[in-house]
Curated annotation (Swiss-Prot):
Organism: Streptococcus pneumoniae serotype 4 (strain ATCC BAA-334 / TIGR4)
One Pfam assignment: SmpB
Keyword Ligase: no
Role description: Required for rescue of stalled ribosomes mediated by trans-translation. Binds to transfer-messenger RNA (tmRNA), required for stable association of tmRNA with ribosomes. tmRNA and SmpB together mimic tRNA shape, replacing the anticodon stem-loop with SmpB. tmRNA is encoded by the ssrA gene; the 2 termini fold to resemble tRNA(Ala) and it encodes a 'tag peptide', a short internal open reading frame. During trans-translation Ala-aminoacylated tmRNA acts like a tRNA, entering the A-site of stalled ribosomes, displacing the stalled mRNA.
Cellular localization per UniProt: Cytoplasm
Taxonomic lineage from the root: Bacteria, Bacillati, Bacillota, Bacilli, Lactobacillales
Keywords: Cytoplasm, RNA-binding
Sequence similarity: Belongs to the SmpB family.
InterPro entries with a match to the protein in the record: SmpB (IPR023620), SsrA-bd_prot (IPR000037), SsrA-bd_prot_CS (IPR020081)
Disulfide bonds: none
Molecular function GO terms recorded: RNA binding
Main location per the UniProt record: cytoplasm
Protein name in UniProt: SsrA-binding protein
GO cellular component, one term: cytosol
Length: 155
């Protein structure tokens, strides 16, 4: 865990496989009472999520927060759009980078920090299939090197 980070509730491992992460930033999430209870219970899925900048606001879409079991009538729709809290300058910078370079905003992880739900957003560029194969090859080569080094060190 990085400095100042709280309890990690959910991670989007597929994001680092499908995208090249250029920059990350922390954003607050606007949630209802039953949603924050579900998040604290780790009942959240970031897999297909993405964020968009619309009218000077950042919105999180396609993130599934399961309905709280004891929430009855107060439960919200599981995949509704949720507002993210960022400073105005951060939003303007993101908007420029997204429009100019064809990048996207991907949720990387959700954690609880000082009692508040925070989202780590990644400014990302999509990988092509051959980029993914290169990443896999590089990872396997590093594993092989580590395996050989371990064998040498044990002798």
């Amino acid at each position: 865990m990085a400095k100042g980070e709280g309890k990690v509730v959910a991670q989007n491992k597929k994001a680092r496989h499908d995208y090249t992460i250029v920059d990350t930033l922390e954003a607050g999430m606007v949630l209802t009472g039953t949603e924050i209870k579900s998040v604290r219970a780790a009942r959240i899925n970031l897999k297909d999520g993405f964020a968009q900048v619309k009218n000077g606001e950042v919105w999180l879409s396609n993130v599934h927060i399961a309905p709280y079991e004891e929430g009855n009538i107060w439960n919200q729709e599981p995949e509704r759009r949720r507002k993210l809290l960022l400073h105005k300058k951060q939003i303007q910078k993101l908007e420029q980078e997204i429009k100019g370079t064809g990048m996207t905003l991907v949720p990387l992880k959700v954690y609880i920090k000082d009692g508040y739900a925070k989202l780590l957003l990644g400014l990302a560029k999509g990988k092509h299939d051959y980029d993914k194969r290169e990443s896999i090859k590089r990872r396997e080569q590093n594993r092989d090197i580590a395996r050989v080094m371990k064998a040498v060190n044990q002798r």
